Amino acid sequence: MMEAKIFWKQFENGGKKKIPSIDIIFYPIIKIRGDSDVLNWSFTLTNKQFISEYETISEIGFLMPNAPHIRLKSGVEFTLFEGAKEIANGNIL
């Protein structure tokens, strides 16, 4: 698992109605900036700390051992989706 800073979109701007609570596992879809495709692997995010109302420090990672873990490294920026809806942006710490 990697640590990431997540910037959640406000509900009024198309984000989630409720940001996942601390230690609740969430399964969004991830698109890494610069990649042409959305990664279709089981992906997990667990918020560990709220920095502000719409910012969290979270643990992220792929569930499967054969997933492209090498793509998750410090400095990588990404977008999170729930279905086709963009809900957050983030960067790996």
What is each model feature region?
Residues 1-93:
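C-terminal effector/interaction modules appended to NTPase cores
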